[in-house]
């Protein structure tokens, strides 16, 4: 019975977090939009990114006014790895998957970070490809074979010793986690391009 309750709770938790990531809230006039389709990063911005991006780059994105932004600190709430051929591997609610670069950058803020060690980029791409199909880590626990987005990216670059950051939600301190700033503030990466951040 306890197992069944945990299973039901787990499914509800996954559904809640998935829906939370698709709701945009406007303060004035006050209204909500589910799964909006307009973003501040436009086609020209994406073309600028495509002109400079290289395989192994860490790609980060963020959104204005999304509910999940209240729970994920920083301007860049999602990350992945550009693996070449116009595709990004990242971890989302459905698990680790490969998507088109243009789809990845349907967002309001964007940043591309390049590892200073080119050899690390090659290893990170191989690791990212090997993790396709892994589950999303809804519990944000290390070492369980599932990955939240920044954990996935940091795992692919584990050879660089990516640093976890202190986090707070509503002023309440939580355990250290990988965040967008784990990459943007790291001396192991250099910024290639930043849009609307």
Residues covered by each model-derived region:
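Cysteine-nucleophile amide-bond enzymes
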Residues: 1-197
């Amino acid at each position: 019975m306890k197992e069944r309750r945990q299973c039901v709770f787990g499914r509800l938790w996954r559904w809640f977090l998935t829906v939370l990531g698709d709701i945009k809230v406007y303060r004035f006039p006050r209204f909500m939009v589910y799964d909006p389709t307009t973003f501040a990063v436009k086609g020209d911005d994406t073309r600028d990114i495509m002109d400079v991006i290289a395989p192994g780059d860490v790609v980060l994105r963020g959104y204005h006014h999304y509910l999940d932004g209240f729970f994920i600190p920083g301007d860049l709430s999602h990350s992945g790895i550009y693996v070449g051929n116009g595709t990004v591997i990242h971890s989302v609610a459905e698990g680790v998957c490969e998507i088109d670069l243009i789809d990845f950058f349907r967002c309001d803020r964007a940043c591309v970070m390049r590892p200073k060690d080119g050899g690390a980029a090659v290893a990170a791409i191989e690791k990212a490809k090997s993790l396709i199909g892994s589950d999303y880590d809804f519990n944000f626990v290390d070492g369980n074979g599932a990955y939240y987005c920044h954990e996935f990216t940091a795992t692919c670059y584990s050879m660089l010793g990516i640093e976890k950051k202190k986090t707070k939600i509503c002023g309440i301190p939580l355990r250290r986690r990988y965040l967008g700033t784990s990459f943007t503030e790291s001396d192991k990466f250099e910024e290639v391009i930043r849009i609307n951040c």
